C-alpha cells in the first residue's frame, strides 16, 4: 500500500511539470528552442503561456523570464506587454499586443 501511494505521488508531481494551466489546457502547443532551452508556447486570444520543457539550474529568474518572453514573441510575432508578465521559473504567462511592431 505504501509503495502504491509513493508511486501515485511521484506520478502526480511529474505530471504537473509539463502541464499547461487550466486556461490553456485545450490549446495546441507550438514548440520552440531558444539557445539550449525548449518551450511549449500556447496562445489564446491576447494571452500567451510559455512552458519551459527543460531545466535552467542556477539561472536568475529575470533571465529565465526574458527567455520565455522571447519564446512567446517569436512564436506569436507579437510583443509581450511587460506589465502583464506573471509566472514562475517553469511557466510564464503574458498579454500580447500584435499591433505593436
Annotated model-derived regions:
Residues 49-101:
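Intrinsically disordered, glycine/charged-rich N-terminal periplasmic/extracytoplasmic linker segments
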Residues 1-20:
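Sec-dependent bacterial lipoprotein signal peptides
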Residues 5, 38, 89:
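Solvent-exposed, flexible loop/coil residues
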Residues 18-28:
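Signal peptide cleavage region of secreted peptide precursors
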Residues 26-49:
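Post-signal peptide N-terminal segment of mature Sec-exported envelope proteins
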Residues 15-18, 37, 99:
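Detector for Asparagine
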